[in-house]
C-alpha cells in the first residue's frame, strides 16, 4: 500500500490568470481539490515543497492528506502543469478520495532477478516493453509497484499481463488484451559481409601459396633491349 503523505495548503480566494500570477509571485502555486460529490476548492501550496514532491517521482500515484486551515482531506494528484521553458510547477489538481472509491492509476513495474535470469546468463538481453500498467485500484489501497520475476525466463521467453500477480482489488483497465510486459531477446549475431567473405576466399592457403611466391621471384629478368 502506498504511503500517505501530509501536505499543508491555504485557501485561494481569487481565480483567473491574474490571480494565479499574483500567487506565484508570493512563492506559492495555485491548485484545486475536486470530486467526491463536493464543490471544487481552490488552494495554494508552497512552491518549494511542491516542486520537491513532483521531482521526487511517483507524484501522481502518491496519496496525500491535505490540511486546509485545519480541515484535512485525503486526495491524490491527477494532473499538474509545468512551465514549458523552466520546467517549474504552475498548477496542480487533486482528486478527493471517498471511502470505498476506486480510481485508475499508472502503477510502475519492478523487474526482479534480472542478473540471475537464465536467458541473460546465456547472452540474452532484457527488453522491457512496459514500465508501468494502468490499473483500477481501491482508493485506500493503491499499490506502490507490481513485480515481474524474470528468474525462470530463457531466451525468447516473454512475460504477459496475465502472468503477473496483482494485489487484491486491483484489475487492469485493458482486460481484453494480454499484452507483453518483458521479453528476453537473443544475443546479437553480426553476419559476415560479402566483401569480407570474398577476400577470405581469394587469400592463398597453406604451403601452396608459400611456394608460389619464390617461384615468381626466381623467374629470369627480361633481357635489356639493344640501342
From Swiss-Prot:
Gene3D superfamilies: Ribosomal protein L25, beta domain (2.170.120.20), Ribosomal Protein L25, Chain P (2.40.240.10). Coiled coil: none annotated. GO terms for cellular component: cytosolic large ribosomal subunit. Part of the 50S ribosomal subunit; part of the 5S rRNA/L5/L18/L25 subcomplex. Contacts the 5S rRNA. Binds to the 5S rRNA independently of L5 and L18. The gene is rplY. One of its GO terms (molecular function) is structural constituent of ribosome. Residues 1-22 are annotated as: Disordered. Belongs to the bacterial ribosomal protein bL25 family. CTC subfamily. It comes from Methylocella silvestris (strain DSM 15510 / CIP 108128 / LMG 27833 / NCIMB 13906 / BL2). This is Large ribosomal subunit protein bL25. This is one of the proteins that binds to the 5S RNA in the ribosome where it forms part of the central protuberance. PANTHER family: RIBOSOMAL PROTEIN L25/GLN-TRNA SYNTHETASE, ANTI-CODON-BINDING DOMAIN-CONTAINING PROTEIN (PTHR33284), RIBOSOMAL PROTEIN L25_GLN-TRNA SYNTHETASE, ANTI-CODON-BINDING DOMAIN-CONTAINING PROTEIN (PTHR33284:SF1). Keywords: Ribonucleoprotein, Ribosomal protein, RNA-binding, rRNA-binding. GO terms for biological process: translation.
Amino acid at each position: 500500500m502506498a504511503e500517505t503523505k501530509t501536505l499543508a495548503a491555504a485557501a485561494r480566494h481569487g481565480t483567473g490568470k491574474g490571480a494565479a500570477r499574483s500567487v506565484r509571485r508570493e512563492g506559492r502555486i495555485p491548485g484545486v481539490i475536486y470530486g467526491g460529490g463536493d464543490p471544487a476548492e481552490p488552494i495554494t501550496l508552497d512552491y518549494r515543497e511542491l516542486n520537491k514532491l513532483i521531482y521526487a517521482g511517483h507524484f501522481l500515484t502518491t496519496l496525500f492528506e491535505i490540511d486546509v486551515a485545519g480541515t484535512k482531506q485525503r486526495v491524490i494528484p491527477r494532473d499538474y502543469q509545468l512551465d514549458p521553458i523552466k520546467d517549474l510547477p504552475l498548477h496542480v489538481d487533486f482528486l478527493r478520495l471517498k471511502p470505498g472509491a476506486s480510481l485508475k492509476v499508472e502503477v510502475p513495474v519492478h523487474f526482479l532477478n534480472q542478473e540471475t535470469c537464465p536467458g541473460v546468463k546465456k547472452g540474452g538481453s532484457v527488453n522491457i516493453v512496459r514500465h508501468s500498467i494502468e490499473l483500477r485500484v481501491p482508493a485506500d489501497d493503491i499499490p506502490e509497484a507490481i513485480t515481474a520475476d524474470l528468474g525462470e525466463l530463457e531466451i525468447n521467453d516473454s512475460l504477459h499481463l496475465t502472468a503477473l500477480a496483482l494485489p487484491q482489488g486491483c484489475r487492469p483497465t485493458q482486460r481484453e488484451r494480454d499484452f507483453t510486459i518483458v521479453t528476453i531477446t537473443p544475443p546479437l549475431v553480426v553476419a559476415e559481409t560479402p566483401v569480407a567473405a570474398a577476400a577470405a576466399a581469394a587469400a592463398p592457403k597453406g604451403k601452396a601459396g608459400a611456394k608460389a611466391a619464390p617461384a615468381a621471384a626466381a623467374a629470369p629478368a627480361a633481357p635489356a633491349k639493344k640501342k
